[in-house]
Amino acid sequence: MALVKVGSHPSHGGQVVFNATASFTLDPSDSGKVFILKDAAITVTLPTLSTSLAGFQVKLISGDDSEHIIAGGASKIYGQIGDQNGGDFERIAAASGYTLGTGEIGDWFELISDGTNWYISGLTDNGA
């Protein structure tokens, strides 16, 4: 199984944690969930933007050192990714996706949509 729920108690804010061990596509019911990406390079495909998606929020955490990919942003991903090792931020503007070039356990990304765009923030140890 590619998505396995971890535990039975939702975290603060009603979030539920899942281990993701294969690539998958998010859908509107995944809003508020946390996904731990592990055991392989995982591609997470974003849902199609629409006004009904306004308020969608998801957190992706690297559970290994793979090169995970966020896809399907239709040139509508904006935000910043902090690079702890490099001491700077990578600006993301009108991107369709993002690839974690040198993954580390604990790297994380949060994506929020207003229905028109995706807004990404995150922190990596080694940058993109």
Where are these regions (language model features)?
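A conserved acidic, glycine/proline-rich C-terminal tail/linker
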Residues: E90-T99
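Exposed extracellular interaction/assembly regions and N-terminal maturation sites
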Residues: M1-D88, D114-A128
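Short proline/glycine- and polar residue-rich coil/turn motifs
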Residues: G101-G103
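Extracellular disulfide-bonded cysteine-rich modules/repeats
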Residues: I105-S113
